[in-house]
């Protein structure tokens, strides 16, 4: 694959022998912020002792929320790509897809809070470790980090997650449907053609309430990013197994960070026509090792899934070498491999 400039420029300061690296873009962004001055806070409209909001009718608030949400539901009832699961892999996939303004992307996340396990590092600690060369993705989205020889450390995992979400959700071709569950797949012949959706609270209470039918979202491509096994994990591949479209889901093996991250990126693929698997769900379907609290493979697996989706849509992508947008050397796309698994 093609490579951009090798070394990323940075400014550094001493921190107990460790360099603090901030991407050049981040430096420019901070440089544009206006310096705080007394005049900024002395303006009458910012007088906190006499602060007054403009009046509004309660019904206007209700209409604005309802109209906009329902419009998005109508818009994405038939969409290009549905990403199921808004963890670090799903968000990275959606971010990469959203660079093409003509690709309509819907993200489904059953939690009220997107981000999956990427709000914290391991064992509820706050730092996030990312092995090189995946740190170049952090440079692109302007997340600062401490740089060591073979890896970088973000001081708090939430810095990555909040940054990528704010950049992604600002794009007009992306909609996040959080508190929404994917209850099932739409299958036509041998192809996944969309997802069956419901409010997450409804999906979790089918046993306590009378029958509550779902909704649907058709898609040209479904990206399953449902994480590793658990009450709500690996749901995409487990459903494929239950209907006989794949033979087995052996589950991930014991932890091996070095083997796990390479394997997850390499084997991110279209497992059946119309459905791409990314992130830790790849380890579940392949029986490859779990990686523990390192996150680089989640980001790059998500990027690879995006390019697989672009390829499936017949659009320029890095796998075919015809991608014209900004591509970074961290995209290890293994384009010589067979991208569709045999069921």
UniProtKB/Swiss-Prot annotation:
UniProt record, GO biological process: thiamine biosynthetic process; thiazole biosynthetic process
Keyword Transferase carried by entry: yes
Pfam families for this protein: Thi4 (PF01946)
Compartment(s) of residence: Plastid, Chloroplast
Names of the cofactor(s): Fe cation
Coiled coil: none
Record note on cofactor: Binds 1 Fe cation per subunit.
GO CC annotation, single: chloroplast stroma
Sites where the protein binds substrate: 89, 109-110, 117, 182, 213, 228, 280, 290-292
Domain of life: Eukaryota
Enzyme Commission code: 2.4.2.60
Enzyme class: transferase
UniProt miscellaneous comment: This protein may be expected to contain an N-terminal transit peptide but none has been predicted.
Function text: Involved in biosynthesis of the thiamine precursor thiazole. Catalyzes the conversion of NAD and glycine to adenosine diphosphate 5-(2-hydroxyethyl)-4-methylthiazole-2-carboxylic acid (ADT), an adenylated thiazole intermediate. The reaction includes an iron-dependent sulfide transfer from a conserved cysteine residue of the protein to a thiazole intermediate. The enzyme can only undergo a single turnover, which suggests it is a suicide enzyme. May have additional roles in adaptation to various stress conditions and in DNA damage tolerance.
The family this protein is said to belong to: Belongs to the THI4 family.
Protein name (record): Thiamine thiazole synthase 4, chloroplastic
Protein source organism: Physcomitrium patens (Spreading-leaved earth moss)
């Amino acid at each position: 694959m093609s490579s951009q400039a090798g070394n990323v420029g940075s400014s550094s300061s001493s921190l107990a022998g460790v360099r603090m690296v901030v991407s050049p873009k981040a430096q420019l962004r901070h440089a544009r912020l206006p310096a705080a001055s007394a005049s900024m806070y002395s303006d009458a409209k910012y007088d906190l002792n006499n602060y007054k909001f403009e009046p509004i009718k309660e019904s206007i608030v209700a209409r604005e929320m309802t109209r906009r949400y329902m419009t998005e539901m109508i818009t994405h009832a038939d969409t290009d790509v549905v990403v199921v699961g808004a963890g670090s892999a799903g968000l990275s996939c959606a971010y990469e897809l959203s660079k093409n303004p003509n690709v309509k992307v819907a993200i489904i996340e059953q939690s009220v809070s997107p981000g999956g396990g990427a709000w914290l590092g391991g064992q509820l600690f706050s730092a996030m470790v990312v092995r090189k060369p995946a740190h170049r993705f952090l440079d692109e989205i302007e997340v600062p980090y401490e740089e060591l020889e073979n890896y970088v450390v973000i001081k708090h995992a939430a810095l990555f997650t909040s940054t990528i979400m704010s950049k992604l959700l600002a794009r007009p071709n992306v909609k996040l449907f959080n508190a929404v569950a994917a209850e099932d797949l739409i299958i036509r012949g041998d192809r996944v053609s969309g997802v069956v959706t419901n409010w997450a609270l409804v999906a979790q209470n089918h046993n306590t309430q009378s029958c509550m039918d779902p909704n649907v979202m058709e898609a040209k491509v479904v990206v399953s990013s449902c994480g590793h096994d658990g009450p709500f994990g690996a749901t995409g591949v487990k459903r494929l197994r239950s209907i006989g479209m794949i033979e087995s889901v052996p589950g991930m093996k014991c932890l091996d960070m070095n083997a796990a991250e390479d394997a997850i990126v390499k084997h991110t693929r279209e497992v059946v026509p119309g459905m791409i698997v990314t992130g830790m769900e790849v380890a579940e379907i392949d029986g490859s090792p779990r990686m523990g609290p390192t996150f680089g493979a989640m980001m790059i697996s998500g990027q690879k899934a995006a390019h697989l989706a672009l390829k499936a849509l017949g659009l320029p992508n890095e796998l075919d070498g015809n991608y014209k947008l900004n591509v970074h050397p961290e995209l290890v796309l293994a384009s010589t491999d067979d991208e569709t698994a045999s069921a």
